[in-house]
């Protein structure tokens, strides 16, 4: 596994700190979102890819409450066992993908992406909320890439745009693949058109790979075109 990672800290919506770690052999994005900047502020991690030590270093003085898994693919979970053990944070995933997470997975490309079993503390469904300090995230069930794929949506407030952590559902100019086991073009189309199309154009999209985008940028070229 590649040990280096690129970290970018952004206040993209003007009020919520988000750390972006691009890490691992497949250049995954791992996100740290906190409900404040002070020491001990509650935080969550979305998709613990790559290296747990790098994520722990980036967390610094934050208090990790949740580790949210957008889906069950190895490249997004490699750091999950070590990160959960080190922090005691609660693991969150959809029930349809929790079984694989709790069973563990062998490596697809070698030992580097094998994932040991981890208990999913909270199995969330569409419409559920995750509260983090003063922030309240909404769970969107978005199957298509996997049966239990989810996005995490933080509505905008104080005139600022919302944030969408889209996993491998929506990228900049593309969607996640639908030809893997558990994938479905029909379900992906429904997720895009019934769930993501309802979000405001200004919503900032934090995808599982590559750079940031917005719902408005992807509405015509991906969401409505798929």
Would you name each region that the model predicts?
Residues 17-19, 90, 122, 136-138, ...:
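Conserved beta-strand segments of alpha/beta enzyme cores
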Residues 42, 50-135, 161-162, 221-224:
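Active-site HxH/HxHxD metal-binding segment of metal-dependent hydrolases
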Residues 46, 91-93, 165-166, 207:
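Hydrophobic residues in well-ordered beta-strands that form the structural core
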Residues 21-23, 113, 119-121, 141-145:
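Short Gly/Pro-enriched turn/cap motifs at secondary-structure boundaries
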Residues 40, 106-107, 112, 129, ...:
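Metallo-beta-lactamase
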